[in-house]
Every structure is written in structure tokens, then in C-alpha cells.
Amino acid sequence: MTIELTHTTGLDPRSLALRTAMDTETFGLYSEWFASMPEQERARLDAALHTDQEDLTEVVIASEDGVDLGHAALRALADGGYEVKKVFVFPHARGRGLSRILMKEVEDVARAKGETRIVLQTGEKQLEAIALYRAIGYEPIGSYGPYAGLDDLVFFGKNL
């Protein structure tokens, strides 16, 4: 397996295609949960989870033989530091360690920018993601930044 890592931004059409695939999968996991929420709460959650493509200034795409397999990104937080966003590997490419490769790469990018800590948010139904984050040294933290008070989500941080 020869995996190529491409550094780009959220404006890259390849990044958009991968994020769209991730959003489709994630919506399937959480559609009943979203539907059961009061409208005001759902609107607040939608606003917190929304990511403008322009805000993804550091994106890493994993590909093999010209075929995109996965994606991870960094978004600068308003109060400083970086958040890992949109970690996704297509189902047919899972089980090959690509998420670990992508996470290491975005951590290295953050470290090169002088960061000493990185955070991320995921959902409680994304058990494989939670297991990965714990396995690579992320620890549970409280809500932060745009997610303040959204305690139904799962938050992790890691010292770099």
C-alpha cells in the first residue's frame, strides 16, 4: 500500500467530495436523533456543527493510485488553537490504518504551527472514531468554543 498525502484547503473540490460523503454517512447515523430534537435545539446544534469550507485551512487527503480514500482537516478556533475536523475514510478503505495516518499528519501540521494542544468533537454513535482517538492519546474534555453547552456531543483533547 502506497498512500499519498496531499495538503490542500477546504476549497479543494476533492475535499468537498470527501466531506459530502462523510456528511451523508453521519446524517444516516444521527437522523432519528436530530428529528426528535426540539426545533430550537436542533438549530443551535446545526449552527455549532456547521463548518465553512473556507475555515478548513489545513486539509490532508489520503489517496492511493489516484483514488481519494480519506480526509482530515484543521480549523482554527476563535479563541486560539486548532480543532481536528472531518476525519473520514471511505468504508471500503477502512481497516488499513488510514485514520491514524491522517490524524498523525494533522497533528504534525498543528505542531509545526507552534500548537501544543489540539481538540476535536465527535458523536457518541461513532464508536470506531472514539476508540481511535483514545488509542492515539486523546483524552475526554468538556465542551469548547462553538459547542459550549452541547453536552450530548463527545469532546477530546491531546497535548502535542
Q: Each predicted region: which residue ranges?
A:
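C-terminal "cap" of GNAT-fold acetyltransferases
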Residues: I3, H7-L11, E25, K113-V119, ...
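Conserved glycine-rich acetyl-CoA-binding loop
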Residues: G66-V67, G81, F90-K104, D108-K113, ...
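Acetyl-CoA-dependent GNAT
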Residues: I3-K85, F90-P91, M103-E105, V109, ...
